[in-house]
UniProtKB/Swiss-Prot annotation:
This protein is one of the early assembly proteins of the 50S ribosomal subunit, although it is not seen to bind rRNA by itself. It is important during the early stages of 50S assembly. Keywords: Ribonucleoprotein, Ribosomal protein. It comes from Cupriavidus metallidurans (strain ATCC 43123 / DSM 2839 / NBRC 102507 / CH34) (Ralstonia metallidurans). This is Large ribosomal subunit protein uL13. Part of the 50S ribosomal subunit. Pfam families: Ribosomal_L13. InterPro entries: Ribosomal_uL13, Ribosomal_uL13_bac-type, Ribosomal_uL13_sf.
Length: 142
């Protein structure tokens, strides 16, 4: 029996919506990364993007455990000497709700062209409304 390998043209992608209200950041991110890769499907193939589209609503109501609200730090650099910026999870959630979730999921996906294609299937919204109702997304409980 030959090993099955999915073809990019044959992949069927579903749309799912996740309500992140009072959900823990890492638990949501790991499940989302798994579904973006397509590892939940029997036809998963490592070198083919077999994942689904994921819509996350209420990303502003995401939470972290313990004291990570103040202790978890995110860094970025301007490219100039001494140009490092540091922010906490709490400040990032206030200014850019959902960016912490996007960064967490992106870190769990493969690096390279395949990972970049996978992260494009993630749609994060701070509030409960999203513009993807035409795709008739199924509700996904985590």
């Amino acid at each position: 029996m030959k090993t099955f390998s999915a073809k990019p043209a044959e992949v069927k992608r579903d749309w799912y919506v996740i309500d992140a209200t009072d959900k823990v950041l890492g638990r949501v991110a790991s499940e989302v990364a798994r579904r973006l890769r397509g590892k939940h499907k029997p036809e998963f193939t490592p070198h083919v993007d077999t994942g689904d589209f994921i819509i996350i609503v209420n990303a502003a109501k995401l939470r972290v455990t313990g004291t990570k609200e103040q202790d978890k730090k995110y860094y970025r650099h301007s490219g100039y000497p001494g140009g490092i910026y540091e922010t906490t999870f709490g400040k990032m959630q206030q200014r850019f709700p959902g960016r912490a979730l996007e960064k967490a999921v992106k870190g769990m996906l493969p690096k390279g062209p395949l990972g970049y294609a996978m992260i494009k299937k993630l749609k994060v919204y701070a509030e409960a409304e999203h513009p993807h109702s035409a795709q008739q997304p199924k509700v996904l409980e985590i």
